[in-house]
Structure formats: C-alpha cells, structure tokens
Amino acid sequence: MFAAGLAPFYASNFSLWSAAYCSSAGPGGCSFALDPAAVKKPSFCIADILHAGVGEPGPAAEGLVGASAALTAHLGSVHPHASFQAAARSPLRPTPVVAPSEVPAGFPQRLSPLSAAFHQHLPQQSPTQQQQPQQQPPPPPRAVSLQPPTSGTRVVPHHSGSAPAPSSKDLKFGIDRILSAEFDPKVKEGNTLRDLTSLLTGGRPAGVHLAGLQPSAGQFFASLDPISEASAILSPLSSNPRNSVQHQFQDTFPGPYAVLTKDTMPQTYKRKRSWSRAVFSNLQRKGLEKRFEIQKYVTKPDRKQLAAMLGLTDAQVKVWFQNRRMKWRHSKEAQAQKDKDKEAGEKPSGGVPAEGEREERSPSRSEGEAESESSDSESLDMAPSDTERTEGTERSLHQTTVIKASAAGALITASSSTSGSSFSFSSTSSLGSGNTHVGSASSLGGNCSELPSAHQPSVTSSPQSPEIAQAPLAGL
C-alpha cells in the first residue's frame, strides 16, 4: 500500500508527504507526474481539494503505476455510480461524488425529502438544461439557507426554473401598495371588500404548495368557521349596519390587517358612546329634587339608599347631584348679581334729598341758629334771675301789645337813630288817680333790654283788662 501511493491518505501529517509526492521528480517509482499548473505550493483547503484537477486531464496520466489503477478500481467498487477519471484526478485530490443523471433500476426507492423533491422537479427541466451538467464541470456547492418548516408544509428548494420573487406592488401589504391610492382614507367601501375577498381566496406566496399540507393541518384550518371561506365574512355586510361590520373586522383581523378598518373606512367608522344619557321619570325626579332641598351633598350610604328607593344606580344619583349642585350654584350667583344691580339702580334716586325739602329745611335751621345765638348772648350779659324776669315780661308784653293794637286811644310813637331803634307808647285811663302808664323798649347793638311798668296789665293776670280797653273810648 505504501509503494502503491495509498500511504498519504492515512498519514497523520500531510506536510511530510507533500515534498515527495507533490513534486515533479519524486523518489523512485513513488512520484506522481503532475501538470505544470499543479506544481505550486501544496494547499489542503476545502476549495482546493474540491476544485483542483477538475476537468484538467493530466499530461502524464500514463505515469501512474498499476497500483493507481487498482486504487481507481477500488474506489469504483465502493461508489459504483460515480464516474471517476483516473487521468484527471489525483489521489491527493479526492473528487466529490456527483449525483447521477439517470437512476439505475437497482437503486432503492426510499429517498429523503430533498432527494425526492430533486427527482420530482428534474423532468421539468429542458433538454439543454439536462445536458448542461455533462458539458460543464459542476459548480461548487453553495450554502443553502433552509427556513424552518411550518406545520403541515414541506420545504421545497427553488431551482433555476422557478418564478422570480414577487415585487412590492404584488404584495398585499407591500410598501408601494400601502403608499398607493388604495389605502387612501377616501377610498370606497367596494375596493376594501374586493381586497378582502382577494386576500381570503387567492394571493398565496410563491413556492408554498398547498398540496403538501398534511391532512391534520387541512382539517384544522377547515374547522375554523370564521375564516374558512370568504362568504363567512362577506355575508353579514348586506344585513348588519356599518358599525357592526367595523367591529367584526377589528375582531377578525387583528394586527396588520387592522389598516383595512379604521383608516380605509372613515365614513363607516363612528365612535360609540361608552355611556348613554339617563332619562329619569317624574317620580324619580321629584324624589331627587326633594332630597336635594334637604341635603345638597349626599353621603355614600345615603346615596345608595336613595338609589335603591328610586330604582337608580349609585352612579346615576351621584352624577345627578353633581349636575344639580352646579345648576343651583349658577342660579345663586345670577340672583346675587341681579340684586346687586337693583341696589345700584335705587341708590342715586333715594339717597339724594329733593331740592324742595332742602329749601324748607334751611329756614327752620336758620331760625333755630338765631334763637340759640340770642339765648347765648343774653346768658352772657344777664344773671339767671334777670333771664327769668325777662322771659316773663316778654310773654306779658306780647299779650299787652295785642290788646293795645285793638284800642283806639293808644298812641304809638317810634323813633330810630344810628345807634339803635326805640319805640314808646302811652295811654290814659280814668281808673284810680289817673296814673299814666308808659312803656319803652330799646335795643342797642343787638342787645335787648326791656323795662316794663309794674302796673302793666295783662290778659291773664288782671281781670280789669276789658275796662282798660274801653276807658279810652269813654274819654273821647
């Protein structure tokens, strides 16, 4: 085996054999004649091992000894379906096994999923594509990224004849379609329903074959009533109102499908109020009003009791009292403002006294001031006894002057001077000894002093005053 050239396959270190077996002039009969292109620094990378010497017939193929032919026969017996070319391949450069173009009759039919898919799609290729691997060397194997298989589907690798990937316009929710006019809020309802129908019935992604679904998965999807057929969703559209359709879409298509509901159908979208306006009966309203007159703020136990009595909920009673307090507060403020305006209107008319009353009050006030001034002056000049005497004589003088004014025989003389004024009167009578009574009064500088006679008659004090009045008439 060592002389036949099989030793390098089992050596632990290839660098020991590279100089002897990879050079053009090796030791004795153990050297392999290689082409000039292969005479370079030996490399055992995966790419060099797979690609070196492929399709390049060595010019010194005959240089191989019989042991190399035996090696080729041995490899052919191990892999009967692989075509090995001894002249083109070196024992140091093993060639990967290529899948045969025709399956022999003795090949077992138990295939893996990938190989079965390969044989299933192989007849669809054109004859030129089938002859192409024979004319050209096979391309290097590429790393295939296999997606994890979903439940009920088989992963089918895309071959060279598969359809290209769909563009963004063909996708149901691609960027171009979302930005197009179909997702405009002013779009009609018919367009939305058409898109919904096409979404449910067709538009499956390329490369996914529903024929590969397992029976269990198919039965599972068929058991889902809301999304089994398009009619299950489109049937309520003619009978239910638009609001119910809106909520049905939201429940049926959560996530990215929600763009079909709120944004594309603004005419049908209408916000439903979370609460409705409560309508109270007359009995309930009277009960609430009566309780409000007694108690403006109701405690929680009282509120619950009142709600149970009137057949209302606790929240309804609470809201009613809040609104009623607000109304009562506004009415109270309006009444206070009205009273304030009314008082402001009455103040100019009732507060200022009239002109007639002002003129009537002024004379009386002046008279009172004059009396007070005269009394003050008299009290300063005279003693208290004189003041009393003067008051008594004033009353008697006033009475006698009235009597003398009516008498015909009375003589009244008056004279005035620069310093003051004085007047005197005299009368004669035949009573007694015929005494003449003379009275005089003078005022100087505002001071008044009166010196009446001791025998001056008065109406009240002397009963002979009528005779005094008649005496001048008899004498004349």
Swiss-Prot record:
GO BP of this protein: animal organ development; cell population proliferation; embryonic digestive tract morphogenesis; enteric nervous system development; epithelial cell proliferation; liver development; negative regulation of T-helper 2 cell differentiation; organ growth
UniProt xrefs under PROSITE patterns: HOMEOBOX_1, HOMEOBOX_2
Location of the region described as Disordered in the Swiss-Prot/TrEMBL record: 120-169, 328-401, 413-476
Compositional bias segments (type: Polar residues): 435-446, 455-467
Tissue specificity statement from the Swiss-Prot or TrEMBL entry: Expressed in Th1 cells, CD8-positive T-cells, B-cells and NK cells.
GO molecular function, one term: DNA-binding transcription factor activity, RNA polymerase II-specific
Top-rank lineage group of the source organism: Eukaryota
Localization in the cell: Nucleus
Induction, as annotated: By TBX21 in developing as well as mature Th1 cells.
Gene Ontology CC: nucleus
Ranges annotated as biased composition (Low complexity): 123-134, 158-168, 413-434
DNA-binding region range list: 273-332
Listed Acidic residues bias regions: 369-379
CDD domains tied to this protein: homeodomain (cd00086)
Disruption phenotype: Th1 cells lacking Hlx or Tbx21 fail to express normal levels of the Th1-specific cytokine Ifng.
Basic and acidic residues bias (residue ranges): 331-346, 355-368, 386-397
Family listed: Belongs to the H2.0 homeobox family.
Full protein name: H2.0-like homeobox protein
Source organism of this protein record: Mus musculus
Gene: Hlx
